[in-house]
Regions:
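Single conserved hydrophobic/aromatic residue that forms the stacking wall/gate
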Residues: 1-12, 16
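Family-specific signature for flavin-dependent thymidylate synthase
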Residues: 24-28, 37-173
């Protein structure tokens, strides 16, 4: 499976990792990350956001490791998954392995369907169902996309997700 294993071995190093994904059809996506801190005063912030459709599955397994000599570490891990239909399935397994008390570490995980109140709000203002769902997905992913430093990449990602969501409508008709 795809793995991400940054090693924080220099004092005062900072890493911000962002990732988005979209699963459809019967895809199985397996993500594994390791944030390994072995030096003092390091910082890591990991944010995964995914959208699942059809019978796609995702599993995220993440581990923050903080060595005994890594005092002053700040490490954060977040995984959020948005299910577009009931047949999609997601599992998230965040873990902490901390050997030093002088740290700030946390992990968070959610798997949720499209918020029906958000959809209703948009539809009650004349937004068609499909467009409402696209807006919700784009809003969900915006935290990651807006943090990317290259505007052309942001535009490309938005176009890619628009294409995938448009294919979803064509497939369901």
């Amino acid at each position: 499976p795809p793995r991400s294993t940054p090693l924080y071995s220099s004092a005062a190093s900072d890493v911000y990792k962002r990732q988005i994904y979209h699963g459809d059809s019967n895809q199985v996506l397996d993500f594994r990350t390791l944030q390994r801190h072995i030096a003092r005063d390091t910082y890591s912030e990991l944010l995964f956001k995914g959208v699942l459709d059809d019978q796609s599955n995702s599993i995220y397994t993440g581990l923050i490791q903080v060595a005994n000599e890594a005092s002053g570490t700040n490490a954060f891990q977040t995984n959020r998954t948005l299910k577009l239909c009931d047949q999609a399935w997601a599992e998230s397994v965040p873990n902490l392995e901390i050997e030093n008390n002088d740290v700030k570490c946390s992990h968070a995980s959610t798997v949720s369907p499209v918020d029906e109140n958000q959809r209703f709000y948009l539809e009650s203002r004349g937004v068609p169902t499909f467009e409402a769902e696209k807006l919700i997905v784009h809003g969900f992913l915006q935290e990651v996309v807006s943090s990317l430093p290259v505007e052309a990449i942001n535009i490309w990602i938005a176009e890619l997700f628009n294409h995938k969501l448009s294919a979803r409508v064509a497939h369901s008709e």
